Amino acid sequence: MPAVTNGRQTAALDDDVVVFLIGMRINRIRSLRSWLPAFRAMPRMLGELARDPELGFIHGQSFLSGRVILQVQYWRSFELLSAYARGHDHEHLPAWREFNRLVRDSGTVGIFHETYRVGPGTAESLYANMPAFGLGAAVGAVAVAGRGQSAGHRMNPGVADVPAVEPY
């Protein structure tokens, strides 16, 4: 289990990164043969990304909510993410083609992704008494005191740093 860092921290977001949400929703649980290949493809892709940092993948975390499986990923750039997704010598493109062949029009499983480019002044975060998590786990975390006690100040250093409650 990851170690908890006591106190308040924020992501050390000094450069742009890409936040990529990718996942699937199982629409028909009993149609195992339809959605299982899509489900099994993700661990292969994550293994490949972990073995080769040059592909641009920084960090990822998985979440389960009912029928939805979500992977939140952090990438060095959109260009590297796109190159991986379309690369003929990587795991993703064959999995994408197999998904389309098996279930694209069946409705048994849905897939989704959202892509965001974030950087200094466009995102802020707070982690209080937490292990490394999210953006802070991807880019590193620093004490809030060095970046501002309030979310408004962390988003825009020109805004007065007046926290709504007493910081700890």
Where are these regions (language model features)?
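Short S/T/G/P-rich N-terminal loop/turn motif that feeds into the first structured element of a domain
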Residues: M1-V68, L80-A83, S106-Y168
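An amphipathic, aromatic/His-enriched active-site/gating alpha helix that lines ligand/cofactor pockets
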Residues: F78-G110
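Tryptophan-centric aromatic hotspots in well-structured domains and transmembrane helices
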Residues: Y74-R76
